[in-house]
Amino acid sequence: VRGPSGSGKTTLVEIISGISGYQKGEITWFNKTLNARQRRWLCGLVFQFPERYFLGLSVAQELRLGHKRLTTEEQISALTKVGLINLDLKKPPESLSGGQQRRLAIAVQLLRSPKVLLLDEPTAGLDWSVRNGIIELLAKLKDKQTILIVTHEPELFKNLNTDNYELHNGQLIPE
């Protein structure tokens, strides 16, 4: 989904994920209407600015949320998939760069393994090598999960897309 700044792209993924409400309509998954709680279980959301949503814990604790039996090896595997090799698990996420924080947020969602992965500007502000790594990772995930990306740079994801939309005046318009 692409659209100009202020068009509601972030609001769209927040509504789909169940963290924001909506005025009318319904959200369905395989013909079943879902409430906000059901959508929160179904979806994983990676924000454009994930630093706002970390809980002040260590990297390891953020990864382990909801996964009490998660091993260090599983944490390292998820971090490696997003290009965060040799990251100190004891560090707070707030000490990481913006790009590292975004990749950590993606790693958290990889461990959750939601059926729907929602990404708000997943490559914004990342250097090219990291961008390419994230795009390659998403290409591997697209066969296992539904992925919805909102972006100002749809051309970066052209090889992943099966459906493209523009958000214009609150309407999703197929391209």
Model-predicted segments: where are they?
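ABC ATPase C-loop
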Residues: 109-110
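Catalytic Walker B motif of ABC-type/P-loop ATPase nucleotide-binding domains
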Residues: 117-120
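Conserved ABC ATPase "signature" region
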Residues: 72-88
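Conserved ABC transporter NBD signature motif
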Residues: 21-39
